């Protein structure tokens, strides 16, 4: 049999940069103390304040490395805790030249207002650097799964919240295209919030780039074969997340990304036969339908919500 890497080339053209491991991302609690050096050192503009004119200085010169509370970092930039109009926010600083497509995709979410979607407050694109200012939330769902098992009632409520967020996006004509635990933040009151729309696409518009959409292990098979992400692709990804919330395992852990892509495209799914879902198999049946190989076999978001509501009522 041909190697997974050779077979993968036929499925899609993948940028190695997109497949980088992003496990280094660490998000801090919004209650973490932070020192406002802008008030303490008036001679130097502080990265903690991104109001004008400080924001313009940051876009021109960047942030001094010795300043700033880093919330996370990845291939497309670094996220800092900052102040904007007197409030604590999360500010993602990116190199404009490398992130034009990401910025355009993030703009898809700039007008989305939903309790389960991280609010984008401002997007400013400079010649050298660009800045995305967002609502500040807590840690990621992935962080929660890494440390503590989730009670079954919390699992279904998280799944419902993210499904409602996706339903709102789809009704607004936006496909997220990268649903995974690292892109779901947990607020201080326990509400899940969908974030990072850097891979998102608009429904009904042709793809303008050939970039890889999503993360291996979570990407729907039709997308791996070169098709544009659709609402059904988001449902597939959420099905993987639903499995992960009770297994607390990473899909296809330990395999090379090329092998994961090959297996997913061919119809393989994470092992789940021996797991007790806590709902007499109803929850397991739901996520298996969500990750169906054929898009027409996947439930729509309203069907997912209806099933979850029956589980919550138990």
PLM feature spans:
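Short beta-strand micro-motifs within the conserved protein kinase catalytic domain, predominantly
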Residues: 119-128
């Amino acid at each position: 049999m041909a190697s997974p890497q050779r077979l993968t080339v036929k499925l899609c053209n993948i940028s190695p940069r997109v497949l980088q491991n992003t496990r280094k991302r660490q998000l801090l609690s919004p209650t973490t103390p932070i020192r406002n050096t802008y008030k303490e050192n008036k001679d130097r503009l502080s990265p903690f304040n991104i109001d004008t004119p400080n924001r313009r200085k940051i876009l021109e010169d960047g942030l001094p490395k010795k300043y700033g509370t880093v919330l996370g970092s990845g291939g497309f930039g670094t996220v800092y805790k900052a102040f904007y109009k007197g409030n604590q926010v999360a500010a993602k600083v990116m190199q404009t030249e490398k992130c034009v497509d990401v910025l355009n995709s993030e703009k898809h979410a700039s007008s989305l207002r939903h309790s389960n979607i991280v609010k984008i407050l401002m997007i400013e694109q400079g010649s050298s650097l660009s800045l995305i200012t967002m609502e500040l939330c807590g840690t990621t769902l992935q962080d929660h799964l890494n440390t503590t098992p989730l009670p079954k009632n919390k699992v279904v409520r998280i799944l419902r919240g993210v499904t409602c967020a996706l339903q709102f996006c789809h009704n607004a004509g936006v496909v997220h295209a990268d649903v995974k635990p690292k892109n779901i933040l947990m607020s201080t009151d326990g509400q899940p919030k969908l974030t990072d729309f850097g891979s998102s696409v608009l429904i009904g518009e042709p793809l303008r780039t050939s970039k890889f959409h999503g993360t291996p292990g979570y990407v729907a098979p039709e997308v791996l074969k070169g098709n544009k992400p659709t609402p059904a692709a988001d449902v597939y990804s959420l099905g993987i997340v639903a499995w992960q919330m009770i297994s607390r395992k990473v899909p296809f852990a330990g395999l090379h990304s090329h092998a994961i892509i090959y297996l997913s495209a061919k119809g393989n799914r994470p092992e789940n036969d021996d797991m007790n879902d806590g709902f007499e198999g109803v929850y397991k049946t739901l996520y298996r339908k969500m990750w169906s190989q054929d898009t027409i076999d996947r439930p729509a978001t309203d069907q997912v919500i209806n099933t979850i509501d029956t589980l919550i009522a138990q």
